[in-house]
Amino acid sequence: MRTSATNPLRSLNFQRLCWANLLFWTFAFGLIPYLYLHFGGDFLITTGCILAFTVGLIVPGPFNAYIVERFSRKAVFLWSSILQGVCALALLEANLPLIYIYVLSVCFGVFFEFAQNALNNTIVNDLLLSSSRTLGDSLLSWFGRFGLPIGWLCVLYLPQLLGQPALTDALLFIPLCLSIFLVFCTKIPLKAPVKVQLISCDRFWRSCGWPLFLMCLVAAGIEGMLLALVLQTPISATVNNILFIGAGLLAAFFVRKTVFIEADDRAEMFVGLLLYLAALLLLAQPLSSIHNAAYALFGAGCGLTASRLLMYFLKLSGHCQRGTSQNTFMLGWRIGFAIGWSVVVFCYDGLSVSTLYYAGAGVVVGLLCVYLVLVHPWFNKHKDRDFRFKEV
């Protein structure tokens, strides 16, 4: 068996990056319920912040490659993380005009994009051998996904568990501070500077992957819709639902490494979307006793679907296009999440919750058909024929 000396995935530096990514996304996801509570349960303002944050992710994209080539990648992550923390602190200031809240949310998104681009698309690939990067990227993304349930629990559950509601602020910002510390302690190899244009699509947008991008939009839209509905339930119910979503994610992580290791490419996506569908149909029923299982199924479906879509993007990559593919996937998922979340704002008063779930189920059925009939054949035609590295 290879040791950490020959297998970078076992190295302390890579493990630090995985935990740093978990904590980084824990902070970002935890900010959603925190802002919802901070604004007195005003769902409209919270949605505006999410949309402004998403705009902030897009704005700096054309400068991504220039920033990480012109400056130290570690410094880009550290300073961007610090500045997004400053933006978050400013957001929590009482009595800010609404326009300032949205401007700060855009700034938060800008610094978040710079930080995640440095960490997920650049630093991790600098640490790994070419034969280890696909598995490394997959593991890093899984750690980031677990930030969703952990972030929400840090804000909604831990303060009540500890009997100290005043600790909510600290429990929100501690993950970000720990993430900064872990990356600061990571030894990152020096890389010769490469001359790049100030504005480019490198590490920002992979146009040839637009069918996969559209699939990300729809799949993440369902996730955003469901989580928006979850957040509007009483805190105790929200905590319970997030626990089961997290359990489903965890189950999907282990199932993927066993059941799908030698399976057909379509199997993981097919099962993930079927779990999506089953969860939405169960949630549309009035029997609350089956809802816990539905949320667990949804978490598992979300994990499997996102994992396979990322793998498709990586397999689509040509030479030196890995970071661009990763960022395109991230943008698709975050934009789709914001769209799905916003749908609830505009439809929640006019439609029943069960109607939204049935509509979501119909969208999933359509997505599954499009995937099997159009997207998967398209992918087989356009994927990188030289891709030969392990997935799990």
Indicate where each model-derived feature is located.
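Symmetry-related core transmembrane helices of the 12-TM Major Facilitator Superfamily/SLC fold
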Residues: P165-C185, T355-P377
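Cytoplasmic helix-loop-helix junction between adjacent transmembrane helices
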Residues: V106-W142
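Glycine-rich segments within core transmembrane alpha-helices of 12-TM secondary carriers
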Residues: S132-L156, M330-S342
